[in-house]
Amino acid sequence: MLYSSRGDPEGQPLLLSLLILAMWVVGSGQLHYSVPEEAEHGTFVGRIAQDLGLELAELVPRLFQLDSKGRGDLLEVNLQNGILFVNSRIDREELCGRSAECSIHLEVIVDRPLQVFHVDVEVKDINDNPPVFPATQKNLFIAESRPLDSRFPLEGASDADIGENALLTYRLSPNEYFFLDVPTSNQQVKPLGLVLRKLLDREETPELHLLLTATDGGKPELTGTVQLLITVLDNNDNAPVFDRTLYTVKLPENVSIGTLVIHPNASDLDEGLNGDIIYSFSSDVSPDIKSKFHMDPLSGAITVIGHMDFEESRAHKIPVEAVDKGFPPLAGHCTLLVEVVDVNDNAPQLTIKTLSVPVKEDAQLGTVIALISVIDLDADANGQVTCSLTPHVPFKLVSTYKNYYSLVLDRALDRESVSAYELVVTARDGGSPSLWATARVSVEVADVNDNAPAFAQSEYTVFVKENNPPGCHIFTVSARDADAQENALVSYSLVERRLGERSLSSYVSVHAESGKVYALQPLDHEELELLQFQVSARDAGVPPLGSNVTLQVFVLDENDNAPALLTPRMRGTDGAVSEMVLRSVGAGVVVGKVRAVDADSGYNAWLSYELQPETASASIPFRVGLYTGEISTTRALDETDAPRQRLLVLVKDHGEPALTATATVLVSLVESGQAPKSSSRASVGATGPEVTLVDVNVYLIIAICAVSSLLVLTLLLYTVLRCSAMPTEGECAPGKPTLVCSSAVGSWSYSQQRRQRVCSGEGKQKTDLMAFSPGLSPCAGSTERTGEPSASSDSTGKPRQPNPDWRYSASLRAGMHSSVHLEEAGILRAGPGGPDQQWPTVSSATPEPEAGEVSPPVGAGVNSNSWTFKYGPGNPKQSGPGELPDKFIIPGSPAIISIRQEPTNSQIDKSDFITFGKKEETKKKKKKKKGNKTQEKKEKGNSTTDNSDQ
């Protein structure tokens, strides 16, 4: 029942006051109820859930709690209906004593979200205590000679109730001698007394028995009585008289023991014993007064003998009497009022109740961490308390009610920075000097999963040798999570993806807890040079957070692949490769070539060739190129040389340890009249090598003759066209014109337009290209070397170096298989004793200048899986130092490329011949001679015909 009203005539003003108070309650956010004391168990107090705006269904889930601040379980809440009721006996006098206000302060706490409500339940007083006198009987001794209107003080009754229930009225039993003098409300210091209205006569009435009744103002009324026994004494004319009826003294509560309070003075007009006075407290004074004060019976001095406490009692009213020694003795009375002055002797008292500990680091601002109540027993400024908190912390104190504070979150928390706080709450009063008290609050910050695992690097590079054992440990990834407990428990996994037709997990795996990365199978550098993948780190928080790191695993090559020989199409019966060489060949003629590849890389794939010791004797007229594998003659062959030479060529890589392969080459020396040169593709028959060789040669001669006839006709036509353009011939550089012989195959035919452009270039001549059939004699000018000095040397006679722009073209590089690696060095020798030119090719230009044959790289438009053997007539005239060979044999093709040098600034149409990767000139000459332009127009038709053969 909220603000229950009383049914009295002043109900309307009271109702208005209650309405105003209710409006204040709503504005302050607090609830006020009232309940009478001594209410029975289960008495309804109020619908607390409804008044707080809480739904009944959420009381239990939100952990509804009721805290009565040390008042026990006087009140409880029914969580089913949200009603506040009386749980046990409430005694107002026991709770609050004689205090005018008595209330039970409750705190209602609900969670999710955390809310705190303050509820005051006022305990209404009922008239359950009757008035009580200090004693049930009081004896009075009054002399018969006392004049009328003499007053004799009495100790009044007390009522433990308050208000109207403690408002006492007195009634004296009917008699003819005395009436009762009751002080008014503004005469509280004046005691109750009997007033004599008729003279006493001891002889007539020696004793009087009166009954004093005290009645309170409660309903129903309660009463208390005391028996008054009045003894009439014989004459003692004058009673002692104090100079004041009321003495008022103020003492600080920390007054020292023995301090003089006051020295009341009484006088008696009688003489002798009738004038001697004895001082004392009244007989009905309380024991508490006797424990705090002492009165000297002779001097009347009152001193302090006990501890004074303002918080216990703010004033002491002491009845004092002075009695003479006459007979009958007469007494005088006065009252001493001792007011206790408060001093700041009580420090504040702090009580802390933690609610949300530990606090999650993502808690919202304003979250209540703890409730703090403070009490100071002093009064006024000495009892006014202010609270403060340790500075520089993410918390603050908020005053929620009188002497109540809430510790709330003021700033965002970060457990990774500070995991716990030791807070100190200081309560300081307003006294001088002020007193204070402190209390500590430990606030632990609970972790939330707000940090993802982090790797030290975003990418790691790992080097692993190939052919590793399955399951070997290759690396360990480690991620650190700044969170705690399960939020920092990191597990690792692969970010799955596919590598070709296989999944990543078939190559590597990662241990979920340790982060160790294992190779599940042997890695092969030739199959997989770089394995790039990601490892994911996830924590165990909810929701889980994660990050990825990239691993680049480079598979290092080991020398695990021996050189592999490129097998020719036809073999001899004994597995060796046979080749026939004319005895008339001179020194330096390339008669064959051993081609091998190594699947490894780097030095492990750098191949070298050498003859086996048993075959590399001085009598054998052959040698093998160290890095090219080309077999050439070391001298001119003669009749003393064995007709069949067996060569063992050892192919070795540069790995550690080196791996080798051996090729067997059978060289047959034949007379020039016995058989022409045949290629290695037709050197061996199925049943009879010699019969097959003859048949092949017949067809070969017929084909060569046909091709040669066509070539002669082409040359005649070309000569006629050249003669018709004689004015432009003078523009050619000095020297014998170089003829171009085209093969009937047509793959290496050389157009007249190309010939014209080579010849008409500015400055000195560049290297020209000559193609001819191996079965025919070389064209005039290509086999004779008398005119070569002017074509291969400049005006100073110094040998020219090869064009530095010789490179693999994109088409040549694309044709090479990924497992075939370039040899580290190919050697092109200009001549015996001359400087060498290194070529980064699989099979570089021949080091023997006599033959002038080269083979293109593997995949450069020829059959890479065939053996290539070429021989040609030796040139009796050797090139000078630094000169380049003028012919190259194209493997797999019956054509020889002849290279001659022209001036470096000549403009060449590179669309008409193969340059083996030579860079195309990016800038053409802007100025050409007018005659060249005219000649090119005339030869346009002829060049079109020639290009169609290519």
UniProtKB/Swiss-Prot annotation:
Q: Which domain of life is it from?
A: Eukaryota
Query: Sorted alphabetically, which keywords does the UniProt record give?
Result: Calcium, Cell adhesion, Cell membrane, Glycoprotein, Membrane, Repeat, Signal, Transmembrane, Transmembrane helix
Extracellular face residues: 30-697
Which GO molecular function annotations are given, in alphabetical order? calcium ion binding
* Location of the region described as Disordered in the Swiss-Prot/TrEMBL record: 770-808, 827-856, 871-950
So where does this one cross the membrane? 698-718
Q: Name one Pfam family in it.
A: Cadherin_2
Q: Which CDD domains match?
A: Cadherin_repeat
According to its record, what are the GO cellular component terms? plasma membrane
Name this protein carries in UniProt:
Protocadherin alpha-9
Organism, as annotated: Homo sapiens (Human)
The major lineage groups are:
Eukaryota, Metazoa, Chordata, Craniata, Vertebrata
Which gene name belongs to this protein? PCDHA9
